[in-house]
Amino acid sequence: MDATAFHPSLWGDFFVKYKPPTAPKRGHMTERAELLKEEVRKTLKAAANQIKNALDLIITLQRLGLDHHYENEISELLRFVYSSSDYDDKDLYVVSLRFYLLRKHGHCVSSDVFTSFKDEEGNFVVDDTKCLLSLYNAAYFRTHGEKVLDEAIAFTRRQLEASLLDPLEPALADEVHLTLQTPLFRRLRILEAINYIPIYGKEAGRNEAILELAKLNFNLAQLIYCGELKEVTLWWKQLNVETNLSFIRDRIVECHFWMTGACCEPQYSLSRVIATKMTALITVLDDMMDTYSTTEEAMLLAEAIYRWEENAAELLPGYMKDFYLYLLKTIDSCGDELGPNRSFRTFYLKEMLKVLVRGSSQEIKWRNENYVPKTISEHLEHSGPTVGAFQVACSSFVGMGDIITKESFEWLLTYPELVKSLMNIARLLNDTASTKREQNAGQHVSTVQCYMLKHGTTMDEACEKVKELTEDSWKDMMELYLTPTEHPKLIAQTIVDFARTADYMYKETDGFTFSHTIKDMIAKLFVDPISLF
C-alpha cells in the first residue's frame, strides 16, 4: 500500500482535551461501588449451596467484568464445583457451563461428559436455545482430537442459526447473535461487559445490585482509560513534532484500544501505557520497513536497533534518525516510570524490537528475491515474530507487578509453544484479513499466497485453508493453556487475551489499518459512559 493511502486519525486531539469528573463526583461513584461490591460478595458466598446457582453467578460476574473483584471467592467455589458430583449430569446447560468454567480456570475436565447427550446414531439430542448456547461456548475450549467438541460446534451452529428464524425473547436473541459472531471464550472481556450489561438488564432474573455495580465498575474504569489516552496521545503528538513522519498510520487511540482489550483491569494502567507506546513504535517500524523505506535504508535501521546506542543514528537518513532517537528516549522513559527495582525490564523491550527487525529484514530479502517459502510452517517460523503479537504481549508484562519475574521474561524470549501459538494465530488472522491489499501493494508474500502457489488454489480457497490452520492454532493454545507450568497463570491468561484481540481486530478486515470499522466500539469503550438508570 502506498503510505499516503493510510487514512488520517479519526480522533485527532479528542482525548488531549479530556477533563475528568470532579473529585466529589468520582468519590461518590467509588463509594457506591464499594458498598455494592460487599453486597455482591455476600450473594457469591450464599451461592455455594447449589452448584447451578454458583455457576450462573460466576459466569454472570465474568461477563459483566466484575470477576477480578472476587478472584479468591470464585477460585474457591470452582474448586468445590470440580470436586463435587452434586449436580444434574443430565442437564446439558449445567454440564456445558461447568465444563466451560472449569477449563477456563485450568481444571482438566474430560469432553466425554458430552457423549451422553447423543443418540444411538451419534447425533446430539437438544433443541433448547439456552442449552445450545451453553454447549456451543463450551465446545470452543476444544483441543486436538476432541471429536465430540468439533461435532458439537457444527451441530449447535446449525441449530442456533435456525433458531433465529423463530421469535425469541429479546435478551436471548441478542445472545444468539453475539455468540454466532464470536464464541464467548474468544470475546474481548471489556467489550463483553459493554455488550452484556444491556442484555443482563433485560433478564427477568437479574440481580439489581450486580447490574448497578457492573455499570459503575465500567464507568470508573473508563475514567482511568481516558486519563491514559490523554498521556499517550500527548506522547504521540510529541513524536510527530520531533520526527514529522507523515507517511505512517496515525493510530494511537486504536493502539490503546487494543491494549485495553487485552489488559482491562484498573491495576494494569502502567502496563497499558507502556504496551500502547510499544505498539505505536512497532507500527512505525512496520510502515517504514514494509512500505516506505528502500531496502538499504531498512537494513541500516535494523543495524541501528541491533546496536541500540545514540551514535548509531549517524548511520540513518534524516527521517529515520529522528525516529530512532525518539525510540531510544521512549524506552529510557519507560525505565524511569518502572522505578529502580523494575527498570531492568526495559532490556526485554529492546530485545523484542531486535527480534522484530530481524524478522522484517528476512521478509524484505524474500520480497527482493521473489522467494516464496516452501511451506506455511517455514513461513510462520520467520513471519510469526514480525506480526508484533509477541512483542506487544511481552511489553504488557513489563508494566505489571512483581509476579512477573526476570525468569518469566527469560522464558518468554525462548519462544515457548504458548507464545508460538499466539504468533501463529495473529499472523494467520492478519494475512487472511489483509492479503488482497498487501498483494496488490507488492508487499511480501503472505501465508495465503504461500498456500496458493504451493497447491494451485484460488485466493478464496487458500483463505479457507488458512482459517482451518487458525483453528488448529487455537486448539494448540487451549492445550497449552490447560498444561500446568512453573510460571504465573497470569502469563497464559494474558497471552490468550492477546489472541482474542487479534481475532477481534482481524475478524472481517484489518480493523487496525482501516480503523473506521472499529470506531463505534472505541467510542463505547472510551467516550460513552453507561447510564445508571
Swiss-Prot record:
A motif (DDXXD motif) lies at residues 286-290. Pathway: Secondary metabolite biosynthesis; terpenoid biosynthesis. Keywords: Cytoplasm, Lyase, Magnesium, Manganese, Metal-binding, Plant defense. It comes from Zea mays subsp. huehuetenangensis. One of its GO terms (biological process) is defense response. Mg(2+) 2 binds at D286, D290. One of its GO terms (cellular component) is cytoplasm. It is found in: Cytoplasm. This is (E)-beta-farnesene synthase. Belongs to the terpene synthase family. Sesquiterpene cyclase catalyzing the production of beta-farnesene and alpha-bergamotene in equal amounts from farnesyl diphosphate. Involved in indirect defense by producing volatile signals attracting natural enemies of herbivores. It catalyses: (2E,6E)-farnesyl diphosphate = (E)-beta-farnesene + diphosphate. The lineage of its organism: Eukaryota, Viridiplantae, Streptophyta, Embryophyta, Tracheophyta. Its EC number is 4.2.3.47.
